[in-house]
């Protein structure tokens, strides 16, 4: 191996062994357990975030942690926001998935600090409830029934979640909700409706489709990014 190749190899190895990164040279991104997929370049993901999302939206985020966490295993999820920080599983499919996970959890952080700005005028709430009503109509027309009261609940409800993903099934739900929600996960609760929309806003190349499908949500997120 020549000297140039050796230097490049050593630099790449050092990057892979690095356990501390920063977003906007300010927010620590700490690696508790190395990302299992060696093809994922965390620096690329963080750079993309810095290029696409306004820095001020991260002002209330304390840190990002990547690794194996009991909280993730208990909920059977890849990411979670809690106590001012984002926790991510080190088992990531690819850079796109990691990017979206960080954005999604950032949205939950924003909910915590801008709840009145996001939900105060109830426009998103009204839009979400109307979509839930459309969902009920479609599912019942396909002979899929549950307690009607569940469609009106804004918070996450385990019974409704089990109905959607076990009784209806994710694949079928995705097919039936194409013209209602940006993704099936957005139907689970108001908070996920917002976070899923925020994720799409900064990763989807079809803003016109988003704006047409969820106009109130699109406008709210757009306004939030301009504060």
Put a short name on every predicted segment.
Residues 37-44, 151, 155-158, 212:
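Alpha-helix boundary/N-cap detector
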Residues 102:
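A conserved beta-strand element that flanks and buttresses the S-adenosyl-L-methionine
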Residues 124-172:
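Low-complexity, serine/threonine/proline-enriched polar segments
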Residues 1-36, 62-70, 99, 165-178, ...:
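Non-catalytic architectural context of zinc metalloproteases
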Residues 16-99, 120, 140-148:
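Auxiliary, metal-adjacent structural segments of Zn-dependent hydrolase domains
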Residues 156-227:
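Pan-zinc metallopeptidase signature
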Residues 41-48, 52, 124, 134, ...:
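Exposed alpha-helical structural elements
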Residues 105-125:
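Catalytic Zn2+-binding segment of zinc metalloproteases
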């Amino acid at each position: 191996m020549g000297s140039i190749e050796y230097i490049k190899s050593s630099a790449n190895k050092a990057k892979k062994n690095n356990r501390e990164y920063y977003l906007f040279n300010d927010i620590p991104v700490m690696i508790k357990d190395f990302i299992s997929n060696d093809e994922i370049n965390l620096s690329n993901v963080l750079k993309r975030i810095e290029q696409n999302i306004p820095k001020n939206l991260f002002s209330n985020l304390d840190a990002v942690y990547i690794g194996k966490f009991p909280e993730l295993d208990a909920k059977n999820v890849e990411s979670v926001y809690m106590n001012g920080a984002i926790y991510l599983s080190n088992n990531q499919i690819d850079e796109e998935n990691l990017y979206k996970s960080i954005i999604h959890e950032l949205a939950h952080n924003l909910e915590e600090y801008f709840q009145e700005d996001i939900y105060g005028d109830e426009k998103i709430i009204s839009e979400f409830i109307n979509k839930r009503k459309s969902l009920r109509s479609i599912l019942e027309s396909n002979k899929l029934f549950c307690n009607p009261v569940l469609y009106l609940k804004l918070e996450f409800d385990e019974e409704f979640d089990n109905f959607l993903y076990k009784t209806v099934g994710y694949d079928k739900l995705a097919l039936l909700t194409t013209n209602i929600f940006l993704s099936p996960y957005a139907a689970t609760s108001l908070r996920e409706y917002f976070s899923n929309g925020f994720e799409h806003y900064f990763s989807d190349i079809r803003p016109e489709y988003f704006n047409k499908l969820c106009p109130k949500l699109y406008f709210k997120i757009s306004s939030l990014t301009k504060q």
